[in-house]
Amino acid sequence: MAAPHVCILQTSFAKREDTVAFLKEKVPGVRVEFITDSTLLSDVRANGGPTQAVIDRMTLYAKAAEISGADLIVNSCSTVGEVADIYAKEVNVPVMKIDLPMAKEAVSLGTKIALIATLETTLGPSQRLIEKVGAEQGKKMECTQYLQNPAWDALQAGHPEEHNRILMESIRELDKMGYDAIVMAQVSMRALLPDLKDVKTPLLCSFYSGYGAIADKLNEIAAQKG
């Protein structure tokens, strides 16, 4: 099979090596590249949502990915997930959103969902995605948002342990509240999972479900390429 090529659009310089290692294990010979603009999040936060300038920049990045020969483009940030719906129409390459499989999993588990994030701009798009998936299945979703800005501030100040502590305390409180699922709305929260094995409520993070679906798509593309 021909090796597939994926381009991942990022809004932060997250641990790329974990993503590359996961995809290379699942997809033989895959070429993984990244386009990262770390100013996107601050621009979205400053304006309360994606501006036309943010949309235009991400559309240019998607077109650059297409020109580079990518077989698949991945939107890896929930905050700009709705922007992906726009730029997907401007390229002739399939676009996948990292959090869509997680949203589908949340809907499959029930209708009462807790959403936790450290950025307010992440919660709205994540909730709307879950509600959209639920509506497609005839379900009215009840999403409750939990914003932990102090965790974000701790991370930006160089205190990841404090970031993790704040989030884990909050998640353990949510575990007592009878939700059908707790959605960790930022892919970076995957790092918390090993320390949250005591949580009984299904705890969802987009890394494994999202990149698992992306790996399946890349293998499908490779088979088609021959």
Feature map (PLM): residue ranges:
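Non-catalytic structural scaffold of enzyme domains
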Residues: 1-226
